[in-house]
Amino acid sequence: MAKLTVKDVDLKGKKVLVRVDFNVPLKDGVITNDNRITAALPTIKYIIEQGGRAILFSHLGRVKEEADKEGKSLAPVAADLAAKLGQDVVFPGVTRGAKLEEAINALEDGQVLLVENTRFEDVDGKKESKNDEELGKYWASLGDGIFVNDAFGTAHRAHASNVGISANVEKAVAGFLLENEIAYIQEAVETPERPFVAILGGSKVSDKIGVIENLLEKADKVLIGGGMTYTFYKAQGIEIGNSLVEEDKLDVAKDLLEKSNGKLILPVDSKEANAFAGYTEVRDTEGEAVSEGFLGLDIGPKSIAEFDQALTGAKTVVWNGPMGVFENPDFQAGTIGVMDAIVKQPGVKSIIGGGDSAAAAINLGRADKFSWISTGGGASMELLEGKVLPGLAALTEK
């Protein structure tokens, strides 16, 4: 990565502005999954160990109007972070003004401050989300010319708290998490050790058109599972019963199949049920076709065996999107089968592209077996598409 990183700058005695991704799930004010906080610790610890004063920025949820602020304060995050760091985290509870400035100016070397939810600035004219110039300049003025972007999860967005600050500081650098995300995902796609197999699941072809097109050029095989299977089936005239289908994407699916040169591998059977919820019958299909009155909710046992075979000997695997409705034990065999097939390959570099796949690996107890699990669903998807991420482009070149 030809961008400056946090190790390339002198931090001692400096007020260092840091964009982290603390967009964690909350239930009744309690954090239900703190992985994103844990993921940011190496960068925060490095800054304070080097004698810097860390000033952290993050969003939490979507905030469009005053009422949306309810339950979206970063206060629970400040408490969780303090416990993880073993030291106080200053939390003024505001995004601008004298209270914030005084708290920042009172910081000593090695201390940490968390600014309130950056999206609270969206209530008045979407200043954060629309990268308001004045807001970016103001936030940049709170530091000493160094900005560390460690929020991969928002790197595909041009917001005031990443691109806006970057434009108004002397040096904008990557944190360790951002550096790792780029290294794993970009290197896997651009310079993979072969055979390189991509596995794409999820419900919609429309979400993954760009990704499929890019990966058909780069990968040796692209395996398709999940709900989007049935759009590809229907495009070939295969019966899909009541399965999910995007009628307006049938031509796209047909086109992708035609230009794939046999690289695109579809399931050969499904696990079907007579309803999505409240079903009374679940069974495996004989072949590709889904029965009338039924819908496909997972790939079937023959497909699991075929995908296992397709993954044999793979040295690089990128997986994005579950094979079925994995939240339901009746339809998680496909996702489990594919995960197990990936991680058993000797010397494989295995990467999960965030989102539902990451949740599946964590919930089904296989997270620690993968080389890398991305923290950003949307951002990793755009990298897999070969797009330039605004948050990354805004960093200072080496």
UniProtKB/Swiss-Prot annotation:
Pathway, per record: Carbohydrate degradation; glycolysis; pyruvate from D-glyceraldehyde 3-phosphate: step 2/5
Key words of the record: ATP-binding, Cytoplasm, Glycolysis, Kinase, Nucleotide-binding, Transferase
EC id: 2.7.2.3
Protein name (Swiss-Prot/TrEMBL): Phosphoglycerate kinase
Keyword Cytoplasm: yes
Binding of ATP, residues: K208, G296, E327, G354, G355, D356, S357
Top EC group: transferase
GO terms, molecular function: ADP binding; ATP binding; phosphoglycerate kinase activity
GO cellular component, one term: cytosol
Gene designation: pgk
Bilayer-crossing regions: none
HAMAP family in the record: Phosphoglyc_kinase
GO BP field: gluconeogenesis; glycolytic process
Family named by the database record: Belongs to the phosphoglycerate kinase family.
Cellular location(s): Cytoplasm
Predominant location category: cytoplasm
Superkingdom of source: Bacteria
Binding-site positions, substrate: D21, F22, N23, R36, H59, L60, G61, R62, R119, R157
Catalytic activity from the UniProt record: (2R)-3-phosphoglycerate + ATP = (2R)-3-phospho-glyceroyl phosphate + ADP
Subunit field text: Monomer.
A Pfam family annotated for this UniProt entry: PGK
Regions annotated as coiled coil: none
